[in-house]
Amino acid sequence: ESFIKDQDPILKFDSCGNFMDLNIDERYHHSLEVDSENRIYVPIYNSTDNIDRSLYSEAFYDDGFSILDSNLKNLAKFSLLNIYKNNGYFGDIHSEHNPGTDPFHLNDVQPFKTSDDRDIVLLSIRNNSRILAFDITKNNALWSIDRAVSQQHDIDIFPDKNNEKI
């Protein structure tokens, strides 16, 4: 349980371990990744404030991710429920069966730049056993890898031998 009721903050410390700042805007969880511009990518719980409770139980929560600057200020926020709705994946969590309370369980948000300089994230969505490539500028899914592994967690990108971008 968090030391701040109903919050899972992200904390910032200096290299000596001295507390510098915190952000309690969201319920942050699992990993965090930093891109080449020092933006922080971190999964969040309940990323949609306006979940239609006629479709989802009170226990249902939507995962998503936030992008923060190096001072922990929120730059952008994305909802997996909205990403799934807007990109043809909605049926994967909302078919004739109840989607349950945790249809996504986002474990990792791995940022990278493509060879044409687009900002992409790879999302590790445990409960769908899916890795989803998402263009954060165009707000659209590019591709997914489904069930290649079961309930994966961390995504790491290794440069090829020529250190080329994907």
Where do the language-model regions lie?
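Short, conserved, GDST-rich strand-edge loop motifs in beta-rich repeat architectures
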Residues: 1-6, 44-61, 96, 114, ...
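A short loop-to-beta-strand structural motif that recurs across blades of beta-propeller domains
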Residues: 8-11, 64-66, 130-133
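Short loop/turn segments that connect beta-strands within beta-propeller blades
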Residues: 13-17, 68-72, 135-139
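Surface-exposed loop and turn segments in beta-propeller and other repeat-based domains
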Residues: 20, 73-102, 147-148
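Short coil/turn segments at the loop-to-beta-strand junctions that recur within blades
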Residues: 24-30, 81-85, 140, 147-152
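Signature of short aromatic-glycine-proline-rich micro-motifs recurring in repeat-based ectodomains
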Residues: 27-29, 47-50, 61, 92-112, ...
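Beta-propeller domains
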Residues: 101-166
